[in-house]
Amino acid sequence: MALQLYNTLTRQKDIFEPIDPANVRLYACGPTVYDFLHIGNGRMLIVFDLLFRVLRDLYGADHVRYVRNITDVDDKINARAAERGIDIRVLTDEMTAIFHEDAKALNCLPPTVEPRATEHMAEMIAIIEKLVANGHAYIAEGHVLFDVPSMPDYGKLSKRPLDDMIAGARVEVAPYKRSPTDFVLWKPAKPEEPGWESPWGRGRPGWHLECSAMSWKHLGEVFDIHGGGIDLVFPHHENEVAQTCSAFGHDVMANVWMHNGHLQVEGQKMSKSLGNFLTIRDVLKDWPGETVRFTMLKTHYRQPIDWTLSSLRESQRELDRWYPVARAFDQINPDNIPGIPSSFRDALQDDLNTPEAITILRRLYKDALETTDYAGVHLLLCGKLLGLFDQSLEKWKNWKPASFTVENVTFEDLIKEREEARAAKNWPKSDHLRDVLASYGIVLKDNKDGTTSWEAKR
Protein backbone atom coordinates (compact mmCIF):
# COMPACT_ATOMS: atom_id res chain seq x y z
CA MET A 1 0.00 0.00 0.00
CA ALA A 2 1.03 3.64 -0.39
CA LEU A 3 2.27 5.51 2.66
CA GLN A 4 -0.57 7.41 4.33
CA LEU A 5 0.01 10.00 7.05
CA TYR A 6 -2.46 11.95 9.14
CA ASN A 7 -2.04 15.60 8.21
CA THR A 8 -2.90 18.17 10.87
CA LEU A 9 -3.29 20.72 8.07
CA THR A 10 -6.08 18.78 6.31
CA ARG A 11 -7.38 16.89 9.38
CA GLN A 12 -7.33 13.59 7.51
CA LYS A 13 -5.03 10.79 6.40
CA ASP A 14 -3.45 11.75 3.09
CA ILE A 15 -1.43 9.64 0.68
CA PHE A 16 2.14 10.86 1.05
CA GLU A 17 3.59 12.15 -2.21
CA PRO A 18 7.06 13.63 -1.71
CA ILE A 19 8.04 16.71 -3.68
CA ASP A 20 11.11 14.79 -4.87
CA PRO A 21 11.27 11.03 -4.10
CA ALA A 22 15.05 11.22 -4.44
CA ASN A 23 15.21 13.86 -1.68
CA VAL A 24 12.47 13.34 0.92
CA ARG A 25 12.67 16.13 3.52
CA LEU A 26 11.56 15.93 7.15
CA TYR A 27 11.86 18.52 9.95
CA ALA A 28 11.08 17.95 13.63
CA CYS A 29 11.34 20.51 16.42
CA GLY A 30 14.17 19.52 18.74
CA PRO A 31 14.88 20.39 22.38
CA THR A 32 15.55 23.66 24.14
CA VAL A 33 18.75 22.67 25.91
CA TYR A 34 18.49 24.13 29.40
CA ASP A 35 17.53 21.04 31.44
CA PHE A 36 17.02 17.28 31.25
CA LEU A 37 14.28 16.29 28.81
CA HIS A 38 11.12 14.75 30.26
CA ILE A 39 9.67 11.45 29.11
CA GLY A 40 7.08 13.24 26.96
CA ASN A 41 9.95 14.71 24.94
CA GLY A 42 11.22 11.16 24.61
CA ARG A 43 7.98 10.17 22.91
CA MET A 44 8.46 12.83 20.25
CA LEU A 45 12.02 11.64 19.63
CA ILE A 46 10.89 8.03 19.19
CA VAL A 47 7.90 8.87 16.97
CA PHE A 48 9.90 10.88 14.45
CA ASP A 49 12.81 8.48 14.59
CA LEU A 50 10.34 5.77 13.57
CA LEU A 51 9.06 7.96 10.72
CA PHE A 52 12.68 8.52 9.63
CA ARG A 53 13.23 4.74 9.59
CA VAL A 54 10.03 4.08 7.63
CA LEU A 55 10.90 6.74 5.05
CA ARG A 56 14.42 5.31 4.69
CA ASP A 57 12.96 1.83 4.24
CA LEU A 58 10.57 3.12 1.58
CA TYR A 59 12.76 5.56 -0.37
CA GLY A 60 16.31 4.47 0.52
CA ALA A 61 18.59 5.71 3.29
CA ASP A 62 20.46 8.08 0.96
CA HIS A 63 17.26 9.77 -0.20
CA VAL A 64 15.81 10.98 3.12
CA ARG A 65 17.00 14.15 4.85
CA TYR A 66 15.97 14.53 8.49
CA VAL A 67 16.58 17.84 10.25
CA ARG A 68 16.05 18.07 14.02
CA ASN A 69 17.17 21.34 15.54
CA ILE A 70 18.76 22.40 18.80
CA THR A 71 17.31 25.56 20.37
CA ASP A 72 20.26 27.12 22.18
CA VAL A 73 18.97 30.69 22.64
CA ASP A 74 15.95 31.17 24.89
CA ASP A 75 14.81 32.96 28.06
CA LYS A 76 14.84 29.66 29.97
CA ILE A 77 18.45 29.07 28.97
CA ASN A 78 19.44 32.55 30.13
CA ALA A 79 17.68 32.07 33.47
CA ARG A 80 19.17 28.62 34.12
CA ALA A 81 22.72 29.73 33.24
CA ALA A 82 22.39 32.70 35.61
CA GLU A 83 20.97 30.44 38.32
CA ARG A 84 23.94 28.08 38.02
CA GLY A 85 26.47 30.87 37.56
CA ILE A 86 27.87 29.46 34.32
CA ASP A 87 28.28 30.68 30.76
CA ILE A 88 25.30 30.08 28.49
CA ARG A 89 27.38 28.12 25.96
CA VAL A 90 28.72 25.89 28.75
CA LEU A 91 25.13 25.11 29.78
CA THR A 92 23.87 24.44 26.26
CA ASP A 93 26.86 22.26 25.36
CA GLU A 94 26.41 20.26 28.57
CA MET A 95 22.69 19.70 28.06
CA THR A 96 23.10 18.95 24.35
CA ALA A 97 25.59 16.20 25.21
CA ILE A 98 23.15 14.74 27.75
CA PHE A 99 20.34 14.92 25.19
CA HIS A 100 22.47 13.00 22.69
CA GLU A 101 23.14 10.30 25.29
CA ASP A 102 19.41 9.98 26.03
CA ALA A 103 18.47 9.82 22.34
CA LYS A 104 21.11 7.15 21.71
CA ALA A 105 19.88 5.10 24.68
CA LEU A 106 16.36 5.22 23.17
CA ASN A 107 17.94 3.84 19.97
CA CYS A 108 17.14 6.94 17.92
CA LEU A 109 19.20 7.35 14.77
CA PRO A 110 21.15 10.62 14.48
CA PRO A 111 19.34 13.07 12.21
CA THR A 112 20.92 13.96 8.89
CA VAL A 113 21.46 17.51 10.13
CA GLU A 114 21.20 18.92 13.66
CA PRO A 115 21.43 22.71 13.36
CA ARG A 116 21.82 25.09 16.29
CA ALA A 117 19.71 28.22 16.38
CA THR A 118 22.72 30.42 17.25
CA GLU A 119 24.39 29.38 13.99
CA HIS A 120 21.53 30.74 11.85
CA MET A 121 21.25 34.42 12.76
CA ALA A 122 21.93 35.51 9.17
CA GLU A 123 18.97 33.45 7.93
CA MET A 124 16.70 34.83 10.67
CA ILE A 125 17.62 38.41 9.86
CA ALA A 126 17.06 37.74 6.14
CA ILE A 127 13.54 36.41 6.80
CA ILE A 128 12.68 39.44 8.95
CA GLU A 129 13.91 41.80 6.23
CA LYS A 130 11.66 40.04 3.70
CA LEU A 131 8.67 40.32 6.04
CA VAL A 132 9.25 44.02 6.72
CA ALA A 133 9.72 44.73 3.01
CA ASN A 134 6.47 43.05 1.98
CA GLY A 135 4.36 44.56 4.74
CA HIS A 136 3.97 41.52 7.01
CA ALA A 137 6.17 42.88 9.83
CA TYR A 138 6.74 46.24 11.51
CA ILE A 139 9.25 47.87 13.86
CA ALA A 140 8.13 49.22 17.24
CA GLU A 141 10.25 50.31 20.22
CA GLY A 142 13.25 48.24 19.18
CA HIS A 143 11.12 45.17 18.47
CA VAL A 144 10.18 43.68 15.13
CA LEU A 145 6.74 42.06 15.17
CA PHE A 146 4.77 39.93 12.74
CA ASP A 147 1.56 41.67 11.70
CA VAL A 148 -0.93 38.81 12.09
CA PRO A 149 -3.96 40.58 10.49
CA SER A 150 -1.84 41.06 7.34
CA MET A 151 -2.14 37.31 6.69
CA PRO A 152 -5.79 36.54 5.79
CA ASP A 153 -5.53 32.79 6.37
CA TYR A 154 -3.65 32.95 9.67
CA GLY A 155 -4.89 30.07 11.81
CA LYS A 156 -5.20 27.57 8.95
CA LEU A 157 -3.05 24.96 10.72
CA SER A 158 -4.66 25.12 14.16
CA LYS A 159 -8.10 25.95 12.69
CA ARG A 160 -8.50 28.87 15.10
CA PRO A 161 -10.47 31.89 13.82
CA LEU A 162 -8.55 35.14 14.23
CA ASP A 163 -11.43 36.81 16.09
CA ASP A 164 -11.36 34.04 18.70
CA MET A 165 -7.61 34.46 19.13
CA ILE A 166 -7.98 38.21 19.63
CA ALA A 167 -10.74 37.64 22.21
CA GLY A 168 -8.58 35.11 24.01
CA ALA A 169 -5.47 37.28 24.14
CA ARG A 170 -4.23 38.40 27.55
CA VAL A 171 -5.71 41.58 28.97
CA GLU A 172 -2.28 43.19 29.30
CA VAL A 173 -0.96 43.53 25.76
CA ALA A 174 2.35 45.27 25.04
CA PRO A 175 1.48 48.85 24.01
CA TYR A 176 3.72 48.68 20.93
CA LYS A 177 1.64 45.88 19.36
CA ARG A 178 -0.82 46.84 16.64
CA SER A 179 -2.89 43.73 17.35
CA PRO A 180 -2.98 41.55 20.48
CA THR A 181 -2.14 38.52 18.31
CA ASP A 182 1.05 39.98 16.80
CA PHE A 183 4.16 38.09 17.84
CA VAL A 184 7.83 38.96 18.23
CA LEU A 185 10.33 38.26 15.47
CA TRP A 186 13.21 40.19 17.05
CA LYS A 187 13.58 41.81 20.46
CA PRO A 188 16.22 43.97 22.14
CA ALA A 189 18.76 42.15 24.28
CA LYS A 190 19.73 43.41 27.72
CA PRO A 191 23.45 44.10 28.26
CA GLU A 192 23.89 40.90 30.28
CA GLU A 193 22.00 38.75 27.76
CA PRO A 194 23.34 37.17 24.57
CA GLY A 195 22.67 39.35 21.56
CA TRP A 196 23.48 39.80 17.89
CA GLU A 197 23.84 42.91 15.78
CA SER A 198 20.99 43.53 13.35
CA PRO A 199 19.45 46.38 11.33
CA TRP A 200 17.17 46.97 14.35
CA GLY A 201 19.92 47.07 16.96
CA ARG A 202 21.52 44.47 19.18
CA GLY A 203 18.98 41.80 20.02
CA ARG A 204 17.89 38.21 19.69
CA PRO A 205 15.23 36.30 17.77
CA GLY A 206 11.77 35.23 18.80
CA TRP A 207 11.35 31.49 19.38
CA HIS A 208 9.14 30.84 16.35
CA LEU A 209 11.56 32.45 13.91
CA GLU A 210 14.36 30.01 14.70
CA CYS A 211 12.69 26.95 13.17
CA SER A 212 11.62 28.88 10.07
CA ALA A 213 15.23 29.90 9.49
CA MET A 214 16.74 26.46 10.08
CA SER A 215 14.20 24.58 7.97
CA TRP A 216 14.68 27.10 5.12
CA LYS A 217 18.46 26.76 5.27
CA HIS A 218 18.54 22.96 5.28
CA LEU A 219 15.31 21.90 3.54
CA GLY A 220 14.21 24.82 1.37
CA GLU A 221 11.23 27.17 1.25
CA VAL A 222 8.73 24.28 0.98
CA PHE A 223 9.42 20.72 2.13
CA ASP A 224 7.61 17.46 2.75
CA ILE A 225 6.92 16.89 6.46
CA HIS A 226 7.10 19.01 9.62
CA GLY A 227 6.54 17.37 13.00
CA GLY A 228 6.47 17.87 16.74
CA GLY A 229 4.34 17.41 19.83
CA ILE A 230 0.63 18.27 19.77
CA ASP A 231 1.30 21.19 22.14
CA LEU A 232 3.31 22.91 19.38
CA VAL A 233 0.41 23.24 16.91
CA PHE A 234 -0.45 26.64 18.38
CA PRO A 235 1.21 29.03 18.62
CA HIS A 236 4.63 27.69 17.55
CA HIS A 237 3.81 25.85 14.35
CA GLU A 238 1.05 28.26 13.39
CA ASN A 239 3.53 31.11 13.63
CA GLU A 240 6.16 29.20 11.68
CA VAL A 241 3.63 28.82 8.86
CA ALA A 242 2.80 32.53 9.01
CA GLN A 243 6.44 33.66 8.87
CA THR A 244 7.62 31.28 6.19
CA CYS A 245 4.63 31.55 3.85
CA SER A 246 4.54 35.35 4.15
CA ALA A 247 8.29 35.68 3.58
CA PHE A 248 8.52 33.44 0.53
CA GLY A 249 5.06 33.78 -1.00
CA HIS A 250 3.97 30.13 -0.84
CA ASP A 251 0.64 28.73 0.34
CA VAL A 252 2.34 26.09 2.50
CA MET A 253 5.57 25.68 4.44
CA ALA A 254 5.37 21.88 4.63
CA ASN A 255 2.90 19.69 2.79
CA VAL A 256 2.30 17.40 5.78
CA TRP A 257 2.16 18.37 9.47
CA MET A 258 2.37 15.54 12.01
CA HIS A 259 1.90 15.77 15.77
CA ASN A 260 2.22 13.17 18.51
CA GLY A 261 -0.20 13.05 21.44
CA HIS A 262 0.26 13.96 25.09
CA LEU A 263 1.77 11.73 27.77
CA GLN A 264 0.44 11.34 31.31
CA VAL A 265 1.83 9.31 34.20
CA GLU A 266 -0.32 6.74 36.00
CA GLY A 267 -3.50 8.49 34.84
CA GLN A 268 -2.41 11.98 35.90
CA LYS A 269 -0.88 14.94 34.12
CA MET A 270 2.86 14.93 34.65
CA SER A 271 3.95 17.75 36.95
CA LYS A 272 6.61 18.44 39.54
CA SER A 273 3.95 19.42 42.09
CA LEU A 274 2.41 15.92 41.89
CA GLY A 275 5.82 14.28 42.27
CA ASN A 276 5.39 12.32 39.03
CA PHE A 277 7.63 14.38 36.76
CA LEU A 278 9.92 11.94 34.97
CA THR A 279 12.95 12.81 32.91
CA ILE A 280 14.24 10.45 30.25
CA ARG A 281 17.34 10.05 32.39
CA ASP A 282 15.25 9.06 35.44
CA VAL A 283 13.52 6.30 33.51
CA LEU A 284 16.71 5.03 31.86
CA LYS A 285 18.26 4.43 35.27
CA ASP A 286 15.71 1.70 35.93
CA TRP A 287 14.76 0.41 32.48
CA PRO A 288 16.61 -0.44 29.26
CA GLY A 289 16.16 2.11 26.50
CA GLU A 290 14.55 -0.49 24.23
CA THR A 291 11.96 -1.25 26.90
CA VAL A 292 11.11 2.45 27.06
CA ARG A 293 10.94 2.65 23.27
CA PHE A 294 8.77 -0.47 22.96
CA THR A 295 6.37 0.85 25.60
CA MET A 296 5.99 4.10 23.65
CA LEU A 297 5.34 2.27 20.38
CA LYS A 298 2.50 0.19 21.82
CA THR A 299 0.25 3.27 21.69
CA HIS A 300 -0.49 4.91 18.34
CA TYR A 301 1.51 8.12 18.12
CA ARG A 302 -1.55 10.38 17.78
CA GLN A 303 -3.27 8.96 20.87
CA PRO A 304 -2.57 10.08 24.44
CA ILE A 305 -0.34 7.61 26.28
CA ASP A 306 -0.64 6.67 29.95
CA TRP A 307 2.87 5.97 31.22
CA THR A 308 2.62 3.25 33.86
CA LEU A 309 4.93 0.87 35.65
CA SER A 310 2.70 -2.02 34.62
CA SER A 311 3.14 -1.15 30.93
CA LEU A 312 6.91 -1.00 31.35
CA ARG A 313 6.87 -4.30 33.19
CA GLU A 314 4.90 -6.01 30.42
CA SER A 315 7.18 -4.58 27.72
CA GLN A 316 10.21 -5.91 29.58
CA ARG A 317 8.64 -9.36 29.80
CA GLU A 318 7.82 -9.44 26.09
CA LEU A 319 11.29 -8.36 25.04
CA ASP A 320 12.85 -10.88 27.43
CA ARG A 321 10.87 -13.60 25.63
CA TRP A 322 11.50 -12.30 22.13
CA TYR A 323 15.20 -11.46 22.32
CA PRO A 324 16.56 -15.05 22.38
CA VAL A 325 14.34 -16.01 19.42
CA ALA A 326 15.15 -12.92 17.33
CA ARG A 327 18.90 -12.83 18.00
CA ALA A 328 19.26 -16.53 17.16
CA PHE A 329 19.20 -15.49 13.49
CA ASP A 330 22.06 -12.97 13.56
CA GLN A 331 24.32 -14.99 11.27
CA ILE A 332 21.79 -15.82 8.55
CA ASN A 333 22.59 -14.46 5.09
CA PRO A 334 19.84 -11.90 4.34
CA ASP A 335 20.11 -12.69 0.62
CA ASN A 336 18.57 -16.08 1.37
CA ILE A 337 15.58 -14.68 3.25
CA PRO A 338 12.28 -13.38 1.87
CA GLY A 339 11.79 -9.68 2.64
CA ILE A 340 9.88 -8.18 5.55
CA PRO A 341 6.25 -9.40 5.46
CA SER A 342 4.05 -7.02 3.48
CA SER A 343 1.48 -6.97 6.30
CA PHE A 344 4.08 -5.44 8.62
CA ARG A 345 5.07 -2.75 6.16
CA ASP A 346 1.40 -2.08 5.43
CA ALA A 347 0.77 -1.46 9.13
CA LEU A 348 3.58 1.09 9.38
CA GLN A 349 2.57 2.74 6.11
CA ASP A 350 -0.93 3.20 7.51
CA ASP A 351 -0.04 6.33 9.50
CA LEU A 352 2.61 4.50 11.56
CA ASN A 353 0.13 2.00 13.00
CA THR A 354 2.51 0.57 15.57
CA PRO A 355 -0.15 -1.29 17.62
CA GLU A 356 -0.97 -3.35 14.52
CA ALA A 357 2.73 -3.79 13.72
CA ILE A 358 3.36 -5.10 17.25
CA THR A 359 0.42 -7.51 16.90
CA ILE A 360 2.24 -8.90 13.87
CA LEU A 361 5.46 -9.21 15.92
CA ARG A 362 3.57 -11.27 18.50
CA ARG A 363 2.28 -13.54 15.74
CA LEU A 364 5.80 -13.96 14.34
CA TYR A 365 7.13 -14.86 17.78
CA LYS A 366 4.44 -17.51 18.19
CA ASP A 367 5.13 -18.88 14.70
CA ALA A 368 8.87 -18.96 15.42
CA LEU A 369 8.28 -21.14 18.48
CA GLU A 370 6.39 -23.52 16.20
CA THR A 371 9.37 -23.49 13.77
CA THR A 372 7.45 -21.78 10.97
CA ASP A 373 9.85 -20.98 8.10
CA TYR A 374 11.55 -17.59 8.48
CA ALA A 375 9.26 -16.41 11.31
CA GLY A 376 12.18 -15.91 13.69
CA VAL A 377 14.27 -13.95 11.24
CA HIS A 378 11.21 -11.92 10.26
CA LEU A 379 10.75 -11.13 13.95
CA LEU A 380 14.31 -9.80 13.97
CA LEU A 381 13.99 -7.77 10.76
CA CYS A 382 10.59 -6.30 11.65
CA GLY A 383 11.76 -5.47 15.15
CA LYS A 384 14.80 -3.69 13.77
CA LEU A 385 12.59 -1.51 11.58
CA LEU A 386 10.89 -0.42 14.82
CA GLY A 387 14.29 0.24 16.40
CA LEU A 388 14.30 -2.94 18.54
CA PHE A 389 16.71 -5.88 18.93
CA ASP A 390 19.69 -3.57 18.63
CA GLN A 391 21.81 -5.34 21.25
CA SER A 392 23.42 -8.75 21.42
CA LEU A 393 21.54 -11.33 23.46
CA GLU A 394 24.34 -11.37 26.03
CA LYS A 395 24.25 -7.61 26.48
CA TRP A 396 20.46 -7.66 26.78
CA LYS A 397 20.51 -10.38 29.44
CA ASN A 398 23.26 -8.67 31.41
CA TRP A 399 21.63 -5.23 31.53
CA LYS A 400 21.32 -3.94 35.09
CA PRO A 401 19.91 -0.71 36.53
CA ALA A 402 22.72 1.84 36.41
CA SER A 403 22.31 2.96 40.01
CA PHE A 404 22.62 -0.42 41.72
CA THR A 405 25.27 -3.05 42.37
CA VAL A 406 24.93 -6.81 42.66
CA GLU A 407 25.71 -7.08 46.35
CA ASN A 408 22.96 -8.52 48.54
CA VAL A 409 23.16 -5.67 51.01
CA THR A 410 21.97 -3.33 48.25
CA PHE A 411 18.95 -5.54 47.63
CA GLU A 412 18.19 -5.78 51.33
CA ASP A 413 18.28 -2.01 51.64
CA LEU A 414 15.88 -1.65 48.73
CA ILE A 415 13.55 -4.29 50.13
CA LYS A 416 13.55 -2.51 53.49
CA GLU A 417 12.80 0.79 51.76
CA ARG A 418 9.90 -0.88 49.95
CA GLU A 419 8.54 -2.30 53.23
CA GLU A 420 8.59 1.22 54.66
CA ALA A 421 6.75 2.51 51.58
CA ARG A 422 4.10 -0.21 51.97
CA ALA A 423 3.69 0.59 55.64
CA ALA A 424 3.13 4.23 54.70
CA LYS A 425 0.71 3.09 51.95
CA ASN A 426 2.89 4.78 49.36
CA TRP A 427 1.84 2.30 46.69
CA PRO A 428 3.43 4.02 43.67
CA LYS A 429 6.84 3.97 45.37
CA SER A 430 6.30 0.40 46.53
CA ASP A 431 5.42 -0.74 43.01
CA HIS A 432 8.34 1.17 41.56
CA LEU A 433 10.84 -0.49 43.90
CA ARG A 434 9.34 -3.90 43.16
CA ASP A 435 9.81 -3.28 39.42
CA VAL A 436 13.37 -2.06 39.86
CA LEU A 437 14.25 -5.21 41.79
CA ALA A 438 12.40 -7.41 39.29
CA SER A 439 14.35 -5.90 36.40
CA TYR A 440 17.46 -6.93 38.33
CA GLY A 441 16.22 -10.51 38.71
CA ILE A 442 15.01 -10.21 42.30
CA VAL A 443 11.47 -11.54 42.82
CA LEU A 444 9.69 -10.44 45.99
CA LYS A 445 7.12 -12.29 48.07
CA ASP A 446 5.09 -10.30 50.59
CA ASN A 447 4.44 -12.43 53.67
CA LYS A 448 1.38 -12.37 55.93
CA ASP A 449 3.43 -11.06 58.86
CA GLY A 450 4.31 -7.91 56.89
CA THR A 451 7.84 -8.95 56.01
CA THR A 452 9.13 -9.56 52.51
CA SER A 453 11.27 -12.41 51.28
CA TRP A 454 13.06 -12.60 47.94
CA GLU A 455 14.82 -14.90 45.54
CA ALA A 456 16.98 -14.39 42.46
CA LYS A 457 15.27 -15.56 39.27
CA ARG A 458 17.42 -14.09 36.52
From Swiss-Prot:
UniProt-recorded Gene Ontology molecular function terms: ATP binding; cysteine-tRNA ligase activity; zinc ion binding
Residues noted as binding Zn(2+) in the record, renumbered to the chain: 29, 211, 236, 240
Motif ('KMSKS' region): 269-273
Alphabetical list of Gene3D superfamilies matching this protein: Cysteine-tRNA ligase, C-terminal anti-codon recognition domain, HUPs
Any single GO BP term: cysteinyl-tRNA aminoacylation
Catalytic activity, EC: 6.1.1.16
Motif 'HIGH' region per UniProt: ranges: 31-41
InterPro entries in UniProt: Cys-tRNA-ligase, Cys-tRNA-synt_Ia_DALR, Cys-tRNA/MSH_ligase, CysS_C, Rossmann-like_a/b/a_fold, tRNA-synt_1_cat_dom, tRNAsynth_Ia_anticodon-bd
Catalytic activity, reaction form: tRNA(Cys) + L-cysteine + ATP = L-cysteinyl-tRNA(Cys) + AMP + diphosphate
Cofactor: Zn(2+)
SUPFAM superfamilies recorded: Anticodon-binding domain of a subclass of class I aminoacyl-tRNA synthetases, Nucleotidylyl transferase
Binding-site list for ATP: 272
Enzyme class per UniProt: ligase
Keywords: Aminoacyl-tRNA synthetase, ATP-binding, Cytoplasm, Ligase, Metal-binding, Nucleotide-binding, Protein biosynthesis, Zinc
Localization in the cell: Cytoplasm
Cofactor binding description: Binds 1 zinc ion per subunit.
Cellular compartments per GO CC: cytosol
Similarity section: Belongs to the class-I aminoacyl-tRNA synthetase family.
Database matches in HAMAP family: Cys_tRNA_synth
Assembly with partners or alone: Monomer.
The name this protein goes by in its record: Cysteine--tRNA ligase
Native source species: Beijerinckia indica subsp. indica (strain ATCC 9039 / DSM 1715 / NCIMB 8712)
Classification lineage: Bacteria, Pseudomonadati, Pseudomonadota, Alphaproteobacteria, Hyphomicrobiales
